[in-house]
Amino acid sequence: MNPLDETRRVADGIRRRVTAFTLKNGGGYLSQACSSAEILATLYTRVMKLGPSVAPPVPPPFGGVPGKNPNYATGAGYNGPHAPELDRFFISPVHYALVLYATLVETGRMAEEGLAMFNQDGGTVEMIGAEHSPGHELMAGSLGQALSQVIGIALGRRRKGETGRNFVFMSDGEFMIGQTWEAMETLSFYELDNVIAYVDANGQSADGKIDEVMGIEPLKERLEAFGAVAVEVDGHDVEALAAAAETPHEGKPLVVIARTNPYCGVEVLAERAPRFHYIRFTGSGEKEALERFYAEKWGGRK
C-alpha cells in the first residue's frame, strides 16, 4: 500500500471506530473524529518521526497517582521512546481521546483490545484523556494548557541539543483562551522553532459555533502578529497536511491551521447543525439514521 492510501486507510479507520463506539455508548465525541481524522492520520503516518511503541499493547489498569508511586507512567510510550533525534507528540484537547486511541490502534501502536477498556472504571483508556492515558503525556483537561507546558519541554530539548521536533495537536476553540496567546507569545520570544502545532479548525465549541461565541478570526494574521509562522490548509487533504510541516520557520514556531468539516465522512450528522460538540442521541431517530449510515458505509466492521 502506498503512503497516500495508508494515510487514507487510517483516517477511515478512525472515523469507523469512533462511530461504532458512539453507537454502542449512546453518544460520544464523534464530530471531533470527523474533523481531525486526516490530521492525526497524516501526523502519524507521514509527518512525525516516532520510534515504535514501548508501551504494553493492552493498556494496564490505572496504577495510582504520581508522587511516591514508583510505577507511575504516562501514556507517552505509545508514541515511542524519548530520544534526542525523535519527535514527540502532545494532544491538547483531551476530549479527543477516543480519536487518538483509534489512531493508535490503526497505526499498530495499541492493541484493539485496548479500545474495549474505554471509559471503564480503574482503567487508563479514559473518555477525557489524562497523562496516563495511551498516547497522552500531559494533563490538559482545561483547554489551552498543553501549549504552555510544551514550551518548557521544547526549551529543555533545545538546550540539550536535541534535534527532535515537538508536535502539538490543538483545537481552534483553544484560541478563545488567553493562556493560548500567552503561550504563543512566549514560543516566539524564545524562538522555539522546534514546536509545530496542528490546529483542527472545525469552527465548533462546546457552546456552539466559535464565531458566535468568541470570534478568533482572522486566525492566521493574529498568529503572525504574535510572531509565529502560520499556514492554512484543507484539513482533509492529506498531501497538503503533510507538505505544511515542511514550511520554513527558522526561529519561529509553526502553526498549521487545518480548516475542517465537523461531519466529514459521516455526512448524516449534518442535520444536527450546529449541535456537534457531543453527539447525544435524541428521540428523533438520530441513532437509527447513524446505524443505517454505518451499515451502508462500513458493513459489519467494528
What do these predicted regions represent?
Residues 11-27, 200-202:
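N-terminal capping segment at the start of a domain
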Residues 34-189:
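Cofactor-binding active-site loop characterized by glycine-rich and histidine/acidic residues
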Residues 64, 238, 244-302:
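Glycine/aspartate-rich loop-and-adjacent alpha/beta segment that forms the canonical ThDP
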Residues 87-89, 164-168, 195, 250-260:
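Generic beta-sheet signal
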Residues 101-103, 130, 179-181, 207-211, ...:
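Short acidic, glycine/serine/threonine-rich loops at helix termini
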Residues 161-163, 211-244, 294-301:
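Conserved thiamine diphosphate
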Residues 177-202, 255-259:
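A short alpha/beta connector and helix-capping loop motif
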Residues 190-215, 225-226, 232:
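A short, conserved beta-to-alpha structural element at the edge of catalytic cores
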